Amino acid sequence: MDRINILDCTLRDGGYVNDFNFGHVVLKDIVQKLSSASIDIIECGFLKSGAFDVNRSLFGSVEAVKKMIGNKNPNLLYVGMVQYGGISNEEIAICDGTSIDGIRLTFHEHEIAPAFVLGRQLIDKGYKVFMQPVGTMTYTDEALLKLITRINELKPFAFYLVDTLGTMYKNDLLRMFYLVDHNLNRNISVGFHSHNNLQLSFANAQELMQLNTPRRLIVDASIYGMGRGAGNLNTELVTQYINSNLGLKYDNLEILEIIDEYIRPLSMKYNWGYDAAYYIASVAGCHPNYASFLLNKQTLHVQDIHAILNNLEFEKRALFDKKYIGEEYIRYMNHHVEDEEAQNQIVNLINGKKVLLLAPGKSLRANTERINQLISEHDDYFVISVNFIPTDIVVDASFISNMKRFKSIQDIVEQ
């Protein structure tokens, strides 16, 4: 393999966007086009216990991956990812060269010991093993050096720097790389997996590839940057950079065909890429799924997301806890407004009148004249519009069900 290698993780990391449901024909064609583009390492998806759906890049066995790969290019590597605890060693067959060649094993800091046991078992089965500690930036130098000592004893194919939270600046990357490069066995590749929360994935990848080191480097990327949250380094950008600066190697037309036929249509249906909320999550040192959770509520302004994320307990920030963020969201919403005072105000405003509720819609527009007549004939009506302010009906108050809409309407009223 060349000194610098690109690993495309579209079918695995990109799978978080569409629940891994690319479709069987699309899965096979993407792998074949990546092969034709000469992408060095193709990640086919997750190995996960019990998974069985030919349309998804989730596989319960290496045999299932084999059926999706089809004819292999002998000059490339095909890999799958195992999240420690997601599948047992017994469910993974011996590597016979007909399916995946390698397994990327991802694990948290508290899972190091059992993950290394599984790593050894996979190496003994003939797989090229990529050891990938989640959130490398959260490791102290001492903890990272201890981990490297164990890596040198294990002798996997590759060891990864993983920017899980998308917080790495150039200086962070270089400091960690030099620490690893100086202490890691020379025969072990160093990989870099980034997330684009701060729009630095491409810049950091260029810095890494420009380093004067004989060590083999692996840079992860996904087509069109497809990946959960802010997404990843774009495969088409980094391959073009290598072609232009380090020597022609990749056929980018094949990658552009994948974008045109499959990925761009998905981008019309699903959202990924840079967003202020993911920037806030990165700066606050929070898992991007926290930002995704709050964005999906569609009730919060960026200022509210900033407040919630920055009030999370520090020990809870790095690992996503859906129950915890749900509780924090409810707590914030409950305390952001003094409900009792608001209730008293609305009771005083209504003051015993009949309440007429107006909701936006076709029937309201069709009956505007009748509604105005009704209001003019009954001075004992208190008129409340729900989630909008009508331009042709005078209302006494408006009820807004979420903060984001409230602030946008508030801006209109103030103007």
Q: How would you label these PLM feature ranges?
A:
Residues M1-E341:
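Catalytic cores and adjacent flexible loops of soluble metabolic enzymes
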Residues M1-I4, L349-V355, D379:
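A short, charged/proline- and glycine-enriched loop
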Residues G15-D19, L364-T368, D392:
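Short N-terminal binding/cap micro-motifs at the start of the first secondary-structure element
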Residues K48, H335-R370, I389, M403:
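Aromatic- and Gly/Pro-rich donor/ligand-binding loops
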Residues D53-A64, I371-I375, V395-S401:
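Glycine-rich loop at the start of a catalytic domain that most often binds anionic cofactors/ligands
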Residues E90-C95, V117-L118, N204, N367-L374, ...:
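A short acidic, amphipathic alpha-helical/loop segment
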Residues L374-F382, F388-Q415:
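Acidic/Gly/His-enriched mid-domain segments of enzyme catalytic cores or analogous surface patches
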